[in-house]
Design a protein with these regions (language model features):
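Structural beta-sheet core signal
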Residues: 108, 133, 172-174
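Conserved strand-turn element in the central/C-terminal portion of the radical SAM core barrel
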Residues: 158-183, 187
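Conserved alpha-helical substructure of the radical SAM core
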Residues: 2-130
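Residue-level signal for the nucleotide or nucleotide-sugar donor/cofactor binding architecture
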Residues: 56, 90, 150, 179-182
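Short, hinge-like loop/turn segments at secondary-structure boundaries
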Residues: 124-127, 149-151, 188
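Generic alpha-helical structural signal
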Residues: 62, 66, 93, 153-156, ...
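Alpha-helix N-cap and loop-to-helix initiation/capping positions
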Residues: 53-56, 60, 146-154
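Conserved radical SAM core fold
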Residues: 86-87, 112-117, 132-148, 178
């Protein structure tokens, strides 16, 4: 092996070693609220629409972001807003704009129930770059698991908004269970 090849291989080995040693922050999940508009049977969070614990104030969250900013490249850290249900926050677009202004790409995990075309447009204007939508089965099984009669319609509406937007990275998150496993092929 010639010296150039050895040099390139050694540089690559060192790069990989540094990545393992440094383990750079790439994703930051923020559970932005404990409030939720559905009552999922499988949920591990203590979320309800009437939770008494207040949401973390936007200013406190942005202070946390500002404290890590000197130590990371914001463009390489995806901030993912989850909950509860992040759409329960009336200041979500403001938070997104502030993340975007600071150079952070941001996304969210949602059940889609509270998503409207207007809200979607507002979030996209605030810099929303990715979205995961919970979609757990066809109508009856999704409604059963989410414990809300309009849960399926909300998820489908949100998926359609995302699918029509070529600039958004999106996916669906499915909790497969004994009732929905036979529906997977049809859900594709």
């Amino acid at each position: 092996m010639d010296i150039r090849k050895r040099f390139v291989l050694e540089l690559e080995r060192l790069r990989r070693h540094n990545l393992q040693e440094l383990h750079p922050l790439q994703q930051l999940f923020w559970e932005s609220t404990l409030r939720c508009n559905v009552h999922c049977l499988h949920c591990g969070s203590d979320c309800t629409s009437s939770v008494t614990a207040p949401d973390m104030p936007k200013e406190d969250f942005l202070r946390v972001i500002d404290s890590i900013t000197p130590h990371v490249n914001p463009n390489k850290v995806m901030v993912i807003v989850s909950g509860g249900e992040p759409l329960m926050r009336t200041d979500l677009a403001e938070i997104g704009r502030e993340l975007n202004r600071r150079g952070y790409p941001w996304g969210m995990v949602t059940n889609g129930l509270a998503m409207t075309e207007k809200r979607y447009a507002e979030l996209r204007q605030a810099g929303l770059t990715s979205m995961s939508v919970s979609f757990d089965g066809l109508h009856d099984n999704h409604v059963w698991l989410r414990q809300h009669p309009m849960a399926f319609e909300g998820a489908v509406r949100t998926i359609k908004l995302a699918a029509a937007d070529k600039g958004l990275t999106w996916d669906v998150v499915t909790c497969v269970n004994q009732r929905s496993i036979h529906e997977l092929e049809e859900m594709r």
